[in-house]
Amino acid sequence: MPIGSAPTPSPEPVLVCGTVRSVQELRPRRGMTILKVLIADDSGAVELTWFNQPFKKKLFHVGMDVAAFGKIEWAYGRRQMNSPDTEQGGLSQEQGFVP
């Protein structure tokens, strides 16, 4: 589903595909990390967020295609998915998404 046409907020989890635009790791305080990955397509963008999972930063790099499955929320003026399931490389029509 194009990111821009996904319902926000989504009552059910949705599958969106996009290209990684940025990867950012924040450390707001000792013992806490927040990983934010911005993915976008022609219709819009969504920020994927994980808490205390810094190892996931190695899985993403700018320019790669990603499929994300989760509930979309509207937070801080943008679409956001918290702790979504992801697949690197996006999805083709023949593939299914395995969480």
What residues fall within each predicted segment?
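Upstream accessory/linker segments immediately N-terminal to the RecA-like ATPase cores of bacterial MutS
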Residues: 6-12, 26-99
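OB-fold nucleic-acid-binding modules
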Residues: 1-16, 20-21
